[in-house]
């Protein structure tokens, strides 16, 4: 049994070798010759999986180690009798922590308290739901927009997108990419919406590039109308608009979900799905794969305020480390993908063990995802 895995899927060789012969290949593009006799293909979001890629091939199963699936033609796979699995929620924590790192950087730079801001979350699924909980743990007001969930009658106070535009100080997008249909999200933030954003609004897109009309966004920024913009995803990729990058506050190479934990979850989820598909189900404990974190433990004295939280967050991950490299190579062919391929290891907040002298600080840090304990000073 021959299994092709994206060369940038951590632990893929180690896990899938339990099931067959593993060959690691580039994801953009996947070499055609490697597909000739492959039984299974494991990809990331850079690989377009469709009839053009797999027609006439022996592949019987496709797994994507990503939460999003817009790069996979699932209808064709089903028609062709090819099994499929994704990894929903695998990188949700990573994206939430990317958003927090960005907001805390902007808050420090511009001198505002996050508790004085209202955050509008568009798309309240694996990412948006976790973001809501962490923001509200800090006492930050959130407004939620998720039309599919609202129409299903799901629990939650869902508002219209127009209401968020009018009332929110931060607008952050966490939707799938749907190019058509009743819940179309392509250019959900279109020229009309972007023109109505209040001066000083913080706009964040860490889901899919075409959810925000990049041309319309550049038009507003070129007009000198004040917005703070955080973009991890672009329209198009990998050939992003360099002029837009010059004008955003934070720009990164589609890496918001790129924690080691998030990528490992993606690999283990598709491994477990494929092992079940071939009739040999196996389970993997994530902590048996992950290495020890760079920082073993730290001690926090006193209560948790915003500057202290910012230092803790940026100790684990400072978004500026990914902004600068993209600006250096923007516009150079192939460099966007190189940044993703050679991405520096990044961990989640749970990897940081924090001993807190203050019990409330320990409780709050745990709610935010840190590995925190109350350890009174004696």
From Swiss-Prot:
Q: Where does substrate bind?
A: 45, 66, 258
According to its UniProt record, the EC number is 1.1.1.290
Kindly state which reaction or reactions the protein catalyses: 4-phospho-D-erythronate + NAD(+) = (R)-3-hydroxy-2-oxo-4-phosphooxybutanoate + NADH + H(+)
Tell me which domain of life the UniProt entry assigns to the organism this sequence originates from: Bacteria
Name the CDD domains for this protein.
ErythrP_dh
Q: Name one GO cellular component term.
A: cytosol
Could you tell me the keywords of this UniProt record? Cytoplasm, NAD, Oxidoreductase, Pyridoxine biosynthesis
The pathway entry for this protein reads as: Cofactor biosynthesis; pyridoxine 5'-phosphate biosynthesis; pyridoxine 5'-phosphate from D-erythrose 4-phosphate: step 2/5
| Residues given in the record as NAD(+) binding sites | 146, 175, 232, 257
Residues at the active site: 208, 237, 254 (proton donor)
Q: Which GO terms describe its biological process?
A: 'de novo' pyridoxal 5'-phosphate biosynthetic process; pyridoxine biosynthetic process
GO MF term (any one): NAD binding
Location of this chain's protein in the cell: Cytoplasm
What is the enzyme's class at the highest EC level?
oxidoreductase
Q: Which HAMAP family match?
A: PdxB
Tell me which family the UniProt entry assigns to this protein: Belongs to the D-isomer specific 2-hydroxyacid dehydrogenase family. PdxB subfamily.
Q: How does it assemble?
A: Homodimer.
**NCBIfam families annotated for this entry?**
PRK00257.1, PRK15438.1
Its biological purpose is as follows: Catalyzes the oxidation of erythronate-4-phosphate to 3-hydroxy-2-oxo-4-phosphonooxybutanoate.
Q: What is this protein called?
A: Erythronate-4-phosphate dehydrogenase
Natural source organism? Klebsiella pneumoniae (strain 342)
């Amino acid at each position: 049994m021959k299994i092709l895995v994206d060369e940038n899927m951590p632990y893929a060789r180690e896990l899938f070798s339990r099931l067959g012969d593993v060959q690691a290949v580039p994801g953009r593009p996947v070499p055609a010759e490697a597909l000739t006799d492959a039984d299974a293909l494991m990809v990331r979001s850079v690989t377009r999986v469709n009839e053009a890629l797999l027609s006439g091939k022996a592949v019987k199963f496709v797994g994507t180690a990503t939460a999003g699936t817009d790069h996979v033609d699932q209808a064709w796979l089903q028609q062709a009798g090819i099994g499929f699995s994704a990894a929903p929620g695998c990188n949700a924590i990573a994206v939430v922590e990317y958003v927090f790192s960005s907001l805390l950087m902007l808050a420090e730079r511009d001198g505002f308290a996050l508790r004085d801001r209202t955050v509008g979350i568009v798309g309240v699924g694996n990412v948006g739901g976790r973001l809501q909980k962490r923001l509200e743990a800090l006492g930050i007001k959130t407004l939620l927009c998720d039309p599919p969930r609202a129409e299903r009658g799901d629990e939650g106070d869902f508002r219209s997108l127009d209401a968020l535009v009018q009332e929110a100080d931060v607008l952050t997008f966490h939707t799938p990419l749907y190019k058509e249909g009743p819940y179309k999200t392509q250019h959900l933030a279109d020229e009309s919406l972007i023109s109505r954003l209040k001066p000083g609004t913080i706009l964040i897109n860490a889901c899919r590039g075409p959810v925000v009309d990049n041309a319309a966004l550049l038009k507003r920024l070129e007009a000198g109308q004040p917005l703070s913009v955080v973009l991890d995803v672009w329209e198009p990729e990998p050939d992003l608009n360099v002029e837009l990058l010059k004008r955003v506050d934070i720009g990164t190479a589609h890496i918001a979900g790129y924690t080691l934990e998030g990528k490992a979850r993606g690999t283990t989820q598709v491994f477990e799905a494929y092992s079940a598909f071939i009739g040999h189900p196996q389970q993997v404990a994530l902590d048996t794969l992950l290495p020890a974190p760079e920082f073993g433990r730290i001690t926090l004295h006193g209560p948790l305020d915003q500057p202290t939280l910012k230092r803790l967050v940026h100790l684990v991950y400072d978004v500026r480390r990914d902004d600068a490299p993209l600006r250096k190579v923007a516009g150079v062919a192939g460099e966007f993908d190189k940044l993703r391929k050679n991405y520096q290891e990044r961990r989640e907040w749970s990897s940081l063990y924090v001993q807190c002298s203050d019990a409330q600080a320990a409780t709050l840090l745990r709610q935010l995802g840190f590995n925190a304990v109350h350890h009174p000073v004696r």
